[in-house]
Amino acid sequence: MFKTDNFDKNIAAMSGEQYKDLKKALCELENLHFTFEFDGKDTLNTNIVNIKNGEKIYTEPLNELMSAIEPFKKEFQRYPCIFFYGIGNGILYKTLLQNQMHERVVVFEDNIELIYMALNLLDFSEALHNGRLIVVLVSDYT
């Protein structure tokens, strides 16, 4: 199973007590049922594929990202706190965190493997450390 420098930085940045269980579970993962599908032309066009059945999370990752970002350029541009369900590849949240008006981006996810994938793909360490990005594994609270 792969582990990147991004993952190590993100785990180190998850320093609060609220991340104790999630960090432990992420570090103990032994098998992944997903892999990345990269587009050599555009890194934003990154998909996640289920290894067992070949299903992709996105039909058109780049187009779906651009559509998802659009409301945050207009009507939600100044929202200080925004909530989402589903981490996907994480690129949407990395993009939204560029807007300093978004003081908190809270992401609920029920699949720990997808959290693992996103934390390996992108460096969220600064946002995790300062609390601008909050990742919640739903099963920790149900």
Label every model-predicted segment.
Residues 1-142:
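N-terminal donor/sugar-recognition subdomains of glycan-related enzymes
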